[in-house]
């Protein structure tokens, strides 16, 4: 094992028994051979479970939608990338030459994906309890700063944060119709989300309100909220 990887293990607070798992977690798909995408898939599932379980215990009075919004904030790519940069994770990534030249070691999505892959690797190397311990340790300051006030965001913001946490494209809004007299108009808006087969719709006395209604409908269609939060 190289000195650099020993340093990374100290930063992560975990020493791998299987060094190949660690190396695989640090290997981007642009690098020749096997890559970290399967570990990322596993780590994402573990991260969401651990964060959800911790929020369930921390906020016993929170509604489902509130818990979902808090979790989306915890596991979004931006949060994970900040953690990854704190570990200097970009210095250890194995990238293809093209990705390396384009600055992939600084890219938010690549850093976040690699951190999720490391979570998956720790789980395979040492089991759920150790993976849970590491995740909660890394996210401790984020957990401490959370309050239910963080859930009081408008639907467009909540939808954007949810999609960002899944590394999905941002929603697209389009005014499809305007009805009524100039002093009393009704705007009809469609919201397109790549995860949904159908566009969500909203209407209101302004474009902004119609977009918020459409975003709220998209959150319900995605199963993030149930319409009663």
Swiss-Prot record:
Gene Ontology terms: biological process: mRNA processing; regulation of gene expression; rRNA processing; tRNA processing
Annotated compartments: Cytoplasm
Gene behind this protein: rnc
InterPro entries: dsRBD_dom, RNase_III, RNase_III_dom, RNase_III_sf
Chief site of localization: cytoplasm
Family statement: Belongs to the ribonuclease III family.
Top EC class for this record: hydrolase
Catalysed transformations (reactions): Endonucleolytic cleavage to 5'-phosphomonoester
One annotated Gene Ontology cellular component of this protein: cytoplasm
Location of the active site: 44, 116
Function per UniProt: Digests double-stranded RNA. Involved in the processing of primary rRNA transcript to yield the immediate precursors to the large and small rRNAs (23S and 16S). Processes some mRNAs, and tRNAs when they are encoded in the rRNA operon. Processes pre-crRNA and tracrRNA of type II CRISPR loci if present in the organism.
tRNA processing among keywords: yes
Domain DRBM: residue ranges: 154-224
Disulfide bridge partners, by residue number: none
Binding site residues for Mg(2+): 40, 113, 116
Subunit text: Homodimer.
Name of this protein: Ribonuclease 3
Keywords annotated in UniProt: Cytoplasm, Endonuclease, Hydrolase, Magnesium, Metal-binding, mRNA processing, Nuclease, RNA-binding, rRNA processing, rRNA-binding, tRNA processing
GO molecular function terms attached to this record: double-stranded RNA binding; metal ion binding; ribonuclease III activity; rRNA binding
Cofactor(s) this protein cannot do without: Mg(2+)
